[in-house]
């Protein structure tokens, strides 16, 4: 399943629909981040806001600043053509580090509440707490610049 998703990212990147940035060293892929410039489904599909749709630092490489660098790189890329960027993040404990990362780097909840499978979850509705249960964050204008500056400072201080 994961291989098919990654192959679809490559095809979409070749067609200009997706941007994929990869962090790697001489031996391995450390992580990656993907951006859809014009989402066709989900929260940002009607807004024109580009969306980070997949962001992974493989567990063995976490805690080394790789996630900060990938987020910085995608923020810089986005700032060349828009002043906004969005991301959805899961609500279960598996996503705890990611939730903190986005808030620490200038992303704020977008105020649309909880979503499940690309749709807002109605009040009192039930949902399965899986990877499809999410909340969306957004960085806008100065927040992207602030995000970049904060990331640069964190990278410098981690050396």
Predicted regions and their residues:
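Conserved acetyl-CoA binding element of GNAT-fold acetyltransferases
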Residues: 45-59, 87-88
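Active-site rim helix/loop that mediates acceptor-substrate recognition in acyltransferases
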Residues: 1-20, 41
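Short hydrophobic/aromatic beta-strand or adjacent loop that forms the aromatic wall/cage
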Residues: 18, 131-137
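Conserved acetyl-CoA-binding loop-helix of GNAT-fold acetyltransferases
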Residues: 57, 63-76, 100-104
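Conserved GNAT acetyl-CoA-binding A-motif
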Residues: 78-91
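Short amphipathic alpha-helix that is part of the acyltransferase structural core
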Residues: 1-4, 24, 29, 154-158
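Conserved catalytic-core motifs of GNAT/GCN5-like acyltransferases
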Residues: 88-90, 106-126
């Amino acid at each position: 399943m994961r291989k098919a998703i990654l192959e679809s990212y490559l095809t979409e990147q070749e067609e200009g629909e997706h941007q994929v940035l990869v962090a790697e060293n001489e031996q391995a892929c450390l992580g990656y981040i993907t951006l859809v410039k014009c989402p066709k489904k989900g929260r940002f599909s009607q807004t024109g806001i580009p969306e980070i749709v997949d962001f992974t630092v493989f567990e063995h490489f976490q805690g080394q600043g790789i996630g900060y660098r990938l987020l910085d790189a995608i923020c810089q890329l986005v700032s060349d053509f828009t002043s906004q960027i969005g991301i959805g993040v899961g609500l279960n404990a598996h996503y705890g580090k990611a939730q903190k990362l986005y808030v620490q780097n200038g992303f704020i909840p977008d105020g649309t509440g909880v979503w499940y499978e690309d749709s807002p979850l109605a009040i009192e509705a039930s949902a399965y707490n899986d990877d499809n249960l999410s909340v969306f964050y957004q960085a806008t204008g100065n927040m992207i610049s602030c995000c970049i500056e904060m990331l640069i400072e964190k990278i410098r201080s981690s050396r």
